[in-house]
Amino acid sequence: VEHLIKKGKKRIAHFRGPLLPQNSIDRFLGYRQALEENRIEYDKDLVFICDEINDSEGYDHMQQILDQKMDVDAVFAVADLPAVGAIKCLIENKVHIPEEVAVMGFSNWLISSLITPSLSTIDQPGELIGRKAFQVFLDESDAKKRKEPVVFKKYEIETTLIERKST
């Protein structure tokens, strides 16, 4: 969201995931925080829920934005698939990307580099996350076998902005 704001975008829609998974909550809170830190008013009407987190939801939400003339200049999607759907809708409606509406995804799936225009996204190191999660599982299993308390550990893993043509 910071990247979109640095590009001059101020009316940023958010295609968020379902209300419960923590990653969906965290990305929504990050969206809110970036708006607040940049003194951009939060508009609940610019937040759309993607229950399935797929391209058709991104397409449908983007079409709704265009039909209702919501004056959006960017979209931040919870994952790459809804962002891909938004791009498809914008292209079919002859909206220029990123000049009129920029689109940003999250996850850096292969499709993000294959579509036209290519999708700017946030890369998260999935293999490293998987290895850390497995190590936590092993540590907790060992602690339980030894009848020791399980110690809560917090890991922060860096993500990387991948800037492509959609922003």
Task: List each model region and its residues.
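Bacterial carbohydrate/catabolite-sensing allosteric modules
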Residues: V1-T167
